[in-house]
């Protein structure tokens, strides 16, 4: 994943993109694996994972690994324990990645949240998650496709119902069959999908009651 730059910040409109660019310039960012500090720091890939969050599936005949990833940056800062004790009274963890946690055997706590705009969408360019096939002999990506649509998501928590394909964060691994299919269900639009293991083409999908 390429390093994030001011030019590569993103927004659904020119206005939230501008705000993301402004916030990028205010953040501390030293590139990949930026360590936390008392100043808000940008981390990408985030602690939510890159290609190491979910599991993977393997085709032993063609020696291909099918792997999904998460491409969401987050921001974090170190707090003293006194700051943490005060902040935890009013700020609880939330599903969008906002988190407060003490760091064992240190005088610090970590305060982290997703790097998102005022509209609640990521400040990084899509895709936000992909599924890839990797040739283990050449160590090259054979194909890579966005993971899912934004049907169940949208700005300010609204469900747009639009089959846009920005590629969403993924939370589990795939299953591969000897018949040349890769099944995947851990997208945020609640579908079970079957991909062609050779090309990555989506050849079937079925809606699920939950995701």
Region roles according to the model:
Residues 1-211:
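Beta-sheet-rich non-transmembrane sensory/scaffold domains
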